[in-house]
């Protein structure tokens, strides 16, 4: 299933000195396939070559996972030091829910607009939610913050939204003993079948 946002059809009220509404970010199906506090399993995020975040891990005070696909925009300054994470090289996320009564999961791929996407993940107890969920968030308008004396000022990109259409593909997965390995295999197959990658495993000796 592909879910898309046609950016040229987004209606905004262009900001003035006193009024106006502009869109900055879009979270795509944030609670799709979210797991509850009673569920067992984990989320898969592309931190480096891949990492798992266990459901209900009780890290309530830890910072929720957030990392920009292909790294941060270096043209925008940093006000705070980011948390220690590996760079995200692949626009793919997933989750596996397993237990006595269920064994299923999914893979999601940012197919269009991934260069302005970030990967987010929270566990139950973080950010006032009882769910474990991971999703893509797309920044459609650049913003920056700076200080002038004691005043904090935030500036936004003017004009219309210049980002391409945003598309995320969702792929349900179900099999006995489903694991993150199956998510990795599903993504490999997607790259071979849809992106023209070549399978070189037969040449390995």
What is the meaning of each model-derived region?
Residues 1-205:
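Carbohydrate-recognition beta-sandwich/jelly-roll modules
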